Amino acid sequence: MATLVSDRKKSARHNGRPAPELIFGDLWEYDPAPETADPKLKARYELFINGQFVAPKSGKYFDSLNPATEQKLASIALANAADVDAACSAAQRAYDNVWGKLSGRERAKYLFRIARLLQDRAREFAVAETMDGGKPIKESRDFDVPMAAAHFFYHAGWADKLEYVAPGRRVAPLGVVAQVIPWNFPLLMCAWKLAPALAMGNCVVLKPAETTSITALKLAEIIQDAGLPPGVVNFVTGAGETGAALMAHPIPAKIAFTGSTEVGKIIMRSLAGTDKKMTMELGGKAANIVFDDAPIDQAVEGIINGIFFNQGHVCCAGSRLFVQESVAAKVITKLKQRMKVLRVGDPLDKNTDVGAINSKEQLRKITQLVAAGVKEGAEIYQSPGKLPAKGWYFRPTIFSNVAMSHRIAREEIFGPVLSILTFRTMDEAIEKANNTAYGLSAGVWTDKGSRILKMSTELKAGVVWANTYNKFDPTSPFGGYKESGFGREGGRQGLLDYCKLA
């Protein structure tokens, strides 16, 4: 609800003066619109092994914090190597005795049930996701939860059609799959990983991120309600030691990891010489490229969405903006105007555009890299307005006059920070965009179809969006090149990474 601060003052137009620039907060005050649905959180969450919630063998727990308030949400079980072994053994038994013998048609029924049950509890899951991760409720509500359900629906449709995954070849499940997911999209990454593995006939041991385990464990409740046989899906929670134990366990035939490039390299080194199959979805430093014939207003919205969606906690975030010189000043001006109306604050407020940074450690990293950008001579602009006194927040930030050698142009910041560079020709844009260790995604804004086709061919990125950004669909494969990883997730191509061919 909006309230006019003062309707007694005569307007600028009435006084014959130019109308002032409208900035939220100058003329209007917005009442909070908090989400009030009960997330139904438990005080303590146990491990989910062999179809049951069980206490960790060590008896140890760690706290899950709300990044918007820094308050404890719940205690989470800390799994050790013995817990991981129990989970892997349960998954192997389930595969040998039940899941591996089921027809695709029967497996599909379970996946459909999970999708429908998730839809039934969508609002509850959205609130839990926002409280645990810090993202705005409108993103959890409108993207994360619906997309998670969509992945289960989509892969349920594939479960009885697997002969078409690789026509002319015989496909078979791998057995037990170990999966490790990040903290930026906890529920969606669960669905992203679980759905194709289960559709193909594999059993799973999944480790959520340490800071965002709650929605994975709530999903375990749905898995119980859906009646999945015990051991088909197992969740082990903990820190790096838990993940290392899972990666090193001899039972899983495949490792699926989404996270930082640094950790991905450690995992690959540890698995060198083994016969385990791997997919790695790692970091990114995506180029968002705007040509002078682009629809500028539409491009500005795409740029804002590309970098500030989920506080920039997105591996494919458009964190490097390349603008053709002739329109650079115009684009930067419009970006600043748009940033002035971004609302940063309580993630549970439906008006909020940018929520809380996921953890204190991530906030520290963002702050350090922004300071490096200032020190190296880039020109900084940050959105105005007050930040909440409590919680981990960072202002949406853009840097202009950035050089390719600057750290902010080379390193993944994983926060709401945009580096702006310019180019003159298409060839220069391609060369600069490809001058990175990463190759996950890119965006192109132009009116010319021929230019889009050439750019999508020349850019070394797994996904290229044209006149849009951050568009995802379960039917479309997602993955990168170079230090952004290998393998694909989603679509028919994603299923290939969860099977063996004969």
Write out the residue ranges for each language-model feature.
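Residue-level signal for inorganic ion chemistry
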Residues: 70, 107, 129, 201, ...
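Structural signal for hydrophobic packing residues in well-ordered secondary-structure cores
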Residues: 95, 99, 115-122, 126, ...
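Glycine-rich loop-to-alpha-helix module at the N-terminal edge of alpha/beta enzyme cores
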Residues: 71-162
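Hydrophobic face of amphipathic alpha-helices that form TPR/SEL1-like repeat modules
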Residues: 2-68, 155
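ALDH superfamily catalytic-core signature
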Residues: 262-403, 432, 466
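Short, well-ordered beta-strand elements within core beta-sheets of diverse protein domains
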Residues: 72-79, 96-100, 179, 288-291, ...
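Conserved C-terminal structural/oligomerization subdomain of aldehyde/semialdehyde dehydrogenase
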Residues: 2-11, 69-74, 228, 252, ...
